């Protein structure tokens, strides 16, 4: 009943080249817990009354009156959502993510990229509000061990297994 946003979204398989850039863009919000409104007061009081030693973010879904149309190149259009989500929660989450990340995806910078206020490139360059340019290279785009979104953990598991095998081989030398 209290999923992290990361647990209910993942990049659609046909768009998997965008997984790394989208992971970087959405990482902070992906680690946010979705709390139903009936539990929001208790959750907020618990956060206020307890020192948890970690950063915790919660969000309480609001009602959304209309369905939002997404550009096919938008970040949100490249996401799949868990089918177990109730329709109202799904509608809210799509709108919430689009509001936070209205970015369009571009293979590389160019004229159209320059004319768009919110953009994301395959190399992980993020342009927000036409003036904030960011690139977080704290981990490689292809490094699935740092990915948090998705219910299919096989890419992350494979990366971790490969790393473990490599480390064991180095130790055995």
Task: Indicate residue ranges for each PLM-predicted region.
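Hinge-like oligomerization/junction regions that interrupt long coiled-coil arms in large cytoskeletal
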Residues: 2-166
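Extended alpha-helical coiled-coil "stalk/arm" regions
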Residues: 166-173
């Amino acid at each position: 009943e209290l999923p992290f946003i990361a647990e209910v979204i993942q990049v659609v398989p046909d768009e998997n080249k965008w997984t790394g850039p989208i992971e970087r863009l959405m990482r902070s919000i992906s680690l946010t817990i979705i709390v139903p409104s009936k539990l929001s007061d208790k959750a907020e009081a618990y956060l206020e009354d307890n020192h948890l030693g970690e950063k915790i973010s919660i969000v309480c879904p609001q009602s959304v009156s209309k369905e939002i149309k997404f550009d096919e190149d938008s970040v949100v259009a490249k996401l799949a959502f868990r089918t177990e989500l109730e329709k109202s929660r799904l509608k809210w989450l799509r709108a919430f993510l689009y509001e936070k990340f209205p970015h369009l995806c571009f293979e590389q910078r160019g004229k159209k990229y320059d004319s768009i206020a919110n953009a994301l490139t395959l190399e992980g360059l993020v342009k927000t509000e036409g003036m904030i340019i960011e690139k977080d290279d704290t981990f490689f785009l292809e490094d699935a061990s740092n990915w948090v979104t998705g219910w299919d953990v096989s890419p992350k598991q494979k990366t971790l297994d490969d790393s473990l095998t490599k480390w064991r081989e180095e130790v055995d030398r």
